[in-house]
């Protein structure tokens, strides 16, 4: 069975490796163009391209698929049975969705219809969801509105960051899409179920502006945001006129004026919130490295009563 693969980041690269390891023929891999990255802004190949080259696969990097006759012709010439799409980042027009014999399967990191859109992992943590998961979806022209082929649940742990949930769902998604491809190969079709009309939510893209901590919120709400925005864009506060990223914290039952520092020690930097307080245990000063609070407190001291 011929499988076109389309994806860009690590989440997708894991799925590509799994599909290849399962023995499926992959005549073509699509990924986004190389982009400048890092402090030196060095042109860097996306993880899917790196994986594809290691696997000896053909890679193409079109800027767009909409109104791109050359790309459409390339896809048609492959005569693929199905396309697997995972965090590709380009919009697939209807003529592309219709090109493979069995259409396009998407690996989506939420339990649809909850958290359709760009940042499902982060929004699930931020909202305090007890669980999330992966859906393998038969793509249509809408935003994550296609019929669901399979659903795989994951219990969000109380200390899970977006990075940790991402890595768990990456492995779940890779295994899930292989299982569904194997079913398609053996049975010639997949049983897909329409998404329910109730329970639809949208996972808006994250912004640096919303990552700024609002101390008037409850400590529980802020703690979830810190985990949801870890590692990027990272929740932050202003400290000495510069943004300081907050990497890990925990809720403590203390009270004070919102934003007031209650204590600063090797055990934690405790800041009052709208309800309860937050004990910060890991942070990253502007231009510095991530550090635990003991390392931070050894070189700096924030007086009780100071405002963040």
From Swiss-Prot:
Cytoplasm as UniProt keyword: no
Pfam family, one: Formyl_trans_C
Superkingdom of this protein's organism: Bacteria
Gene Ontology cellular-component terms listed: cytosol
UniProt-listed GO biological process terms: conversion of methionyl-tRNA to N-formyl-methionyl-tRNA
Catalytically driven reaction(s): L-methionyl-tRNA(fMet) + (6R)-10-formyltetrahydrofolate = N-formyl-L-methionyl-tRNA(fMet) + (6S)-5,6,7,8-tetrahydrofolate + H(+)
Key words, A-Z: Protein biosynthesis, Transferase
GO-annotated molecular function: methionyl-tRNA formyltransferase activity
Enzyme Commission number, as recorded: 2.1.2.9
Transmembrane segments: none
Enzyme class: transferase
Binding site for (6S)-5,6,7,8-tetrahydrofolate: 110-113
InterPro entries xref list: Fmt, Formyl_trans_C, Formyl_transf_N, Formyl_transf_N_sf, Formyl_transferase-like_C_sf, GART_AS, Met-tRNA-FMT_C, Met-tRNA-FMT_N
Keyword Transmembrane helix found: no
Similarity comment text for this entry: Belongs to the Fmt family.
Reported function: Attaches a formyl group to the free amino group of methionyl-tRNA(fMet). The formyl group appears to play a dual role in the initiator identity of N-formylmethionyl-tRNA by promoting its recognition by IF2 and preventing the misappropriation of this tRNA by the elongation apparatus.
PANTHER family linked to this entry: METHIONYL-TRNA FORMYLTRANSFERASE, METHIONYL-TRNA FORMYLTRANSFERASE, MITOCHONDRIAL
Name by which UniProt lists this protein: Methionyl-tRNA formyltransferase
Gene that encodes the chain: fmt
